[in-house]
Amino acid sequence: MNLNATLFAQMVVFLVLAWFTMKFVWPPLINALDERSKKIADGLAAAEKGKAELEAAHKRVDQELAQARNDGQQRIADAEKRAQAVAEEIKANAQAEAARIVAQAKAEAEQQIVKAREALRGEVAALAVKGAEQILKREVDQTAHAQLLNQLKAEL
């Protein structure tokens, strides 16, 4: 094997090239690779964060929809209760009005009965006086008999 100066020169050139590469070329390549891996890691982290935020947003939307449904159902139930209460109130008012009208009609009927009785008492008293007058065939003292008939009327 022949070792000559060319081989040594090539080795020196190779070592200088390796040193130059390690000193000036390799650090930017490593930095570029590190930056790229950092960007990829940041992108993956951002994607995971976005996915988590999306899931959280879906959960919030589902909760808000459920709350809106519950609120709607509650409002419907409240409206039904109010409608039922109004219907009951109207029914109670109608029953009270009917009872009032019936009571008023009964009171008026009682008044009519009392008036009719009073009128009948007066007529009976007048007829009794006429009958007694005709039976006795003499003149009757109107005032004395009127007092007697009023006493009888009061007793009746």
Curated annotation (Swiss-Prot):
Parts of the chain that traverse the membrane: 7-29
Membrane topology listed for this record: Single-pass membrane protein
Subcellular location, record wording: Cell inner membrane
The UniProt record lists the keyword Aminoacyl-tRNA synthetase: no
Cited InterPro entries: ATP_synth_B-like_membr_sf, ATP_synth_b/b'su_bac/chlpt, ATP_synth_F0_bsu_bac, ATP_synthase_B_chain
Keyword terms, alphabetized: ATP synthesis, Cell inner membrane, Cell membrane, CF(0), Hydrogen ion transport, Ion transport, Membrane, Transmembrane, Transmembrane helix, Transport
Family named by the database record: Belongs to the ATPase B chain family.
Listed name of the protein: ATP synthase subunit b
Gene source species: Burkholderia multivorans (strain ATCC 17616 / 249)
